[in-house]
Amino acid sequence: MADTVTSARATARYVRVTPMKARRVIDTVRGKSVEEALDILKYAPQSASEPVYKVVASAAANAENNFGLDRNSLVIAQAWADEGPTMRRFRPRAQGRAFHVRKRTSHITVVVESQKGSAQ
């Protein structure tokens, strides 16, 4: 029975970015080290890179502070973006019409794992 914890997670819920756009950013950093992922996300032009950056940094901080894992050995083991609730709005159009506007939200989850722990 191993009592040592080798992974930590962080979740951002109800983020105002579409899940499809968030997944596009997440796919670029999945499997990379935390430091490399943060460098990529810091300069990525996509709007979804900011919330993903915050979740990755939070997961790394959780691993470091809650479980005593070394930040330099952390790797993004899993990352995904689920669909949150959709806010529905109306955009008035000509001649009394109205178009539906769907403002989609995401739940972004990142799991970081100690590379040394997964090698054992």
UniProtKB/Swiss-Prot annotation:
CDD domains with a match to the protein in the record: Ribosomal_L22
Presence of the UniProt keyword Ribosomal protein in the record: yes
UniProt-listed Gene3D superfamilies: Ribosomal protein L22/L17 (3.90.470.10)
Molecular-function annotations in GO: rRNA binding; structural constituent of ribosome
SUPFAM superfamilies cross-referenced by the UniProt entry: Ribosomal protein L22
Classification via Pfam families: Ribosomal_L22
One GO cellular component term: cytosolic large ribosomal subunit
SS bonds (residue pairs): none
InterPro entries membership: Ribosomal_uL22 (IPR001063), Ribosomal_uL22_bac/chlpt-type (IPR005727), Ribosomal_uL22_bac/org-type (IPR047867), Ribosomal_uL22_CS (IPR018260), Ribosomal_uL22_sf (IPR036394)
GO biological process: translation
Main function: This protein binds specifically to 23S rRNA; its binding is stimulated by other ribosomal proteins, e.g. L4, L17, and L20. It is important during the early stages of 50S assembly. It makes multiple contacts with different domains of the 23S rRNA in the assembled 50S subunit and ribosome. The globular domain of the protein is located near the polypeptide exit tunnel on the outside of the subunit, while an extended beta-hairpin is found that lines the wall of the exit tunnel in the center of the 70S ribosome.
Family according to the record: Belongs to the universal ribosomal protein uL22 family.
Quaternary context: Part of the 50S ribosomal subunit.
UniProt name for this protein: Large ribosomal subunit protein uL22
Origin organism lineage: Bacteria, Bacillati, Actinomycetota, Actinomycetes, Mycobacteriales
